[in-house]
Amino acid sequence: MLKTLRILVISFLILLPNTILYAEEINKPGVASAHPLATKVGYEILAQGGNAFDAAVAISATLSVVEPYSSGLGGGGFFLLHDSSSMEDVFVDAREKAPSNANRDMYLDNDGNVMRSASLDGPLASGIPGLPAALHHVSLDYGTMPLYKLLQPAIRLARDGFPAYERLITALLVAEKSRTLSPKFKEIFMPDGKPPVVGQIVRQPELAKTLEVLASSGHTGFYDSFFTQKMVEESNQDGSIWHLDDFKSYAVTERAPINISFLGAKLTMAPPPSSGGTTIATILNIISQFDFMGMDSAKRAHLITESMRRAYRDRAFNLGDPDFVDVPIDKLISMEHAKELAQSINLDQATPIHEDDDIDGKFALNEGAHTSHFSVLDKNGNRAAVTQTINTWFGSGYMLPSSGMILNNEMDDFSAKPFTPNRYGLVHGEQNSIEPNKRMLSSMTPTFIESDRGVAILGTPGGSRIITMVLLSIIDYFNGGDAQSMTASKRFHHQFLPDVIRHEKDAFTNDVKEDLQIKGHNLQEISNYGNMQVVTFDNATGETESSSDPRGLIEGFEIDFY
């Protein structure tokens, strides 16, 4: 039975305006994910009477099976949830943790240089997984259906298989040439010594059994059982430093989201250990100091770039796990701080790198197609924005033999050595150094927008570029964009170091590129990136629109979603 969504005037934080949402009812739910099979599962759960949180659990588990290069039970994620009955938002932090045996210099050689492959390949690169804990927690605390039922679609797809598709095959070809892949990984995904062909059925029987353990025994079955002991033994035999107590002590953490006001709307975003919310808040606060909406395209691009530069510098020097370090969130997202940063921007010239910022190192900014995001809105107005990951394509490249889980390589998201760039060219300071049981900094940025127009639920994969992709989609929304334009619009990125604007083809006109270069910007055209997933709801019409990024569309699945 449809329930009418009537949202009264709510007073948020003092810094936020009162926002009135006046929809009569939500005519249909919305689901957007990176794989058609996961989207189908989400709609099926909603059709069975489940809420957005039930659907989120089922979608998350399904993506762990059918999109194994992006996320999985061997990784972690962030769940941004909105409960329409209580009007409360919560951020469920299921980020991986460093093992208790981890130490600050574990990826340095005898000369103090970073051994990059050690934090990328094999089980030594793996943090303690958090996604299974999140599935149990979200289902138990926010869902209406039993976890056992929610995991059945993923179990079937792992056991019975799904057709291989171009994106999976491409990821396997790249991994085969560039990564060290474990024997069990090759057995599952390259049974004939090579990747499957399109349409060939991919089965993961051990992963199906792992999902069954989680479905029947929940958190305890995964984190404190004979199953856990077997995982630890296998990974340690191949080089990890896991301890059984690392799993027994793992728990998700609920945190207050980052909330800011922008152009009269409320933005709800991910807090640390995500760097997304604070970084986007800083950028939007900076550009709000100018007549941003009245600028021409060239001035806008320059201002956004200069704001990105400053916000990413803040990220490098200030952010880390808030349970371990003092993160000055209130200062970073304050208007006073934004005004100070805005005053340092010259609208006619790019900011040269200060000599203190010219940190030694090669800043290889790798392509960002990793990680996965999905967005859900149910008919009662509950919503979920979920980003989950194992870091790079296929994580560490190591699959646990008995459980069929691909382990993450999230330890590379720590600062192995302060201000030495990681896989994504990002630099971090002491705040993000390795410590036992610490969560590594992340760029994942699940986001809600609430305005007088309605609601938008969004997020994307893309490594260090996640933040700027979400930022540009937010700006597109305020320019009148819809779900399709938010996923399809062209992108550009600056992350403080390296000092270059990386942009998709046609992100700028020739005139804008010339203007930016005259101002002193370095430009580099790159291939398309990201896989934005957006659901919007229009207050005036009650209509829902779901859109998946055309850059990541998976073909070959004829599915009627709704």
Locate the predicted segments by residue.
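M16/insulysin-pitrilysin zinc metalloprotease superfamily fold
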Residues: 277-292, 449-456, 463-487
